[in-house]
A protein has these predicted regions:
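Structural detector of well-ordered beta-strand residues that form the stable sheet scaffold
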Residues: 56, 81, 102, 155-156, ...
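Buried hydrophobic packing segments
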Residues: 64-69, 90, 94, 196, ...
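PLP-dependent aminotransferase class I/II
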Residues: 39-44, 52-55, 116, 128-132, ...
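Conserved active-site segment immediately N-terminal to the catalytic lysine
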Residues: 157-192, 207, 247-248
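Hydrophobic/aromatic ligand-binding patch that stacks against planar heteroaromatic rings
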Residues: 92-94, 147, 171, 188, ...
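PLP-dependent aminotransferase-like
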Residues: 70-159, 166
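Conserved PLP-binding active-site segment in aminotransferase class I/II-type PLP enzymes
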Residues: 1-71, 75, 149, 246, ...
Length: 403
């Protein structure tokens, strides 16, 4: 039996040192907690990695999803094609905006939308394709972009689970109209616990996103967008009354304001991104090197061809014929202080909050997402794991599956 670790190994975990602490203290000592230089620099850095010219930092990845989808300004009842294996807010954002999700099954070993099943689901009201880079793997975005161009659809890349990906040598965001990401603790880096970002190339869309990020007020594009630096304190209401533009509300907005403290923390984390990703990949490779000897018991995760990425977690499927029960496996791992998780929602239409939503689905259902929902689990690969931690997980898996 493997030696017990000195601590529980959670499915996610951030790491920091004095550099993050000092960056946050510098903002506190300045006495100015408003959106400032740190947010601006962070937006520039992350949008570049996403393959975009412009970025808008927000308070979470879920806020980024709601803002990003909303930027398309679709009509109620319009449709967005998406994966049925996903995270809850990918779909709740679609529904909350009065839109209809059109679901496509996944490839079970990649956990990504089956791009070969997208075209058959396009209908007269379909306006966009939006799907996640689930668990850090990615679908073939070249195929998605080609389908979108053929049918006049917009493309949104949900890259909450991974940052810094390339497909066939180029940033994946080069294929999207909008890309977005998250800085939750479980993700590639964090802004002291949370944060998100919407990225785009269109300056007009950027201004719209800024406006909606903070209450819908007109001043946002003058403070942070294409009109920055213009002397425009006063402006006319529709009836001609001159008014302070900080209190002119041109749109229906939210309060998704990011934190200057979080951005300062995130900039330090961003400088460590390659190190973090390398640590994640090391854990993934160690687990894979072991489980490749047990393919009679498990279906291994498969990275999309010609993709450079870093898996957020190591997900695998227990073969139904193997005799391994998932709950028993998870209890075995957790009894040994290795925490595990499901692969996100599974088939989201089987989740209580989503079973009754308006949607469209293929006639043959979602057999692959159902397989993931019943037999898949994922284990930690996060950059907070040390080499001894990873070795302990390998030993525990070896004990579980017999050497």
């Amino acid at each position: 039996m493997a030696n017990q670790p000195v601590r529980t190994l959670p499915p996610a975990g951030a790491i920091q040192d004095e550099r993050e602490i000092e960056a946050v203290l510098a903002v506190l000592r300045s006495g100015d907690l408003n959106i400032g230089e740190n947010v601006a620099r962070f937006e520039d850095e992350v949008s570049t990695v996403l393959g975009k010219e412009l970025g808008v930092m927000v308070n979470s990845g879920s806020s980024a999803l709601l803002l990003g989808i909303g930027l398309l300004d679709l009509e109620p009842g319009d449709e967005i094609i998406t994966s049925v294996l996903t995270f809850s807010t990918d779909v709740s954002s679609i529904v909350q905006l009065g839109l209809v999700p059109v679901f496509v099954d996944v490839e079970p070993d990649t956990f990504q939308i089956d791009v070969n099943r997208i075209t058959e689901m396009i209908g007269p009201r379909t306006k966009a394709i939006m799907t996640p880079n689930l668990m850090g793997n990615c679908p073939d975005w070249d195929v998605i972009r080609a389908i979108a161009d053929e049918h006049g659809l917009k493309v949104i890349e949900d890259s909450c689970d991974v940052l810094d990906t390339r497909l066939r040598g180029s940033r994946i965001g080069a294929r999207s109209d909008i890309s977005l990401t998250s800085f939750a603790i479980s993700h590639s880096l964090t802004c002291a616990g949370n944060g998100g970002l919407v990225a785009m190339d269109d300056p007009e869309m950027h201004d719209k996103c800024l406006t909606r990020r903070r209450w819908g007020r007109r001043s946002e594009s003058y403070l942070y967008g294409s009109r920055k630096g213009q002397d425009t304190r006063w402006g006319p209401l529709d009836d001609g009354t001159m008014y302070d533009q900080i209190f002119i509300f041109d749109d229906l907005g939210y309060n998704f304001e990011p934190s200057e403290l979080g951005a300062a923390y995130g900039l330090v984390q961003f400088a460590k991104l390659q190190e973090f990703n390398a640590r994640r990949q090391h854990a993934f490779n160690r687990y894979n090197d072991l489980l490749v000897n047990h393919t009679d018991k498990v279906i291994l995760p498969r990275t999309t061809p010609e993709l450079e990425t870093t898996w957020m977690r190591y997900g695998f499927i227990l073969r139904p014929e193997s005799g391994y029960d998932r709950t028993d496996v998870q209890n075995f791992l957790e009894d040994r202080n290795v925490q595990s998780r499901m692969v996100w929602t599974g088939n989201i239409l089987r989740q209580p909050g989503f079973s009754g939503i308006e949607h469209r689905a293929p006639a043959d259902g979602f057999p692959n997402a159902d397989l993931v929902m019943s037999h898949a689990l994922c284990i930690p690969t996060h950059h907070g794991l040390g080499s001894d931690d990873v070795g302990y997980v390998v030993d525990t898996l070896s004990e579980l599956f017999g050497g």
